[in-house]
Amino acid sequence: MLKQFLCVISLLAALPGSALAQNASEIARVQAGQSCPGCNLFQADLSYLDLPHIDVSGARLRQADLSLATMNHANFARANLSVSNLFGARFTGASFAYADLSRATAAGAYFGSADFTGARLDGANLSGAEMETARGLTQAQLNTACGDASTLLPPGLRIPPCR
């Protein structure tokens, strides 16, 4: 029994790191301004960076820090941005089509003309976010998120307050 246990432990130790862990080389690529569709950017620090037109579509950006970054015209389509920090970031013309922004914090972020078609916003904090010219937003999406009186939305849409 002990021999089998040690054999299993040896096999597990020989396997590469978890597929869910960060990929430092892919994170470094994006930090240098290179597109990286489908990359594993889990917990990446992209704060304060200027990354216009970057393509991280389908990437795993869960728990990433994009605070105060400028990512105008970036492609986040189908990316996982759940539990990410987007505080004060600029995303003019960016695509978040079918992206997962569940429980993301986007307080004070600017989303001028950004596309939110089919995006998941469950539990997202959009307090003070500027989304007045955002496209593809629906009331159903916003009903699952929260904001405050300073959240700017397209005409006819509203958002429940954060608690």
Region roles according to the model:
Residues 21-163:
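Tandem repeat scaffolds
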Residues 1-4:
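Positively charged n-region of N-terminal signal peptides that target proteins for export
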Residues 6-16:
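Bacterial N-terminal signal peptides
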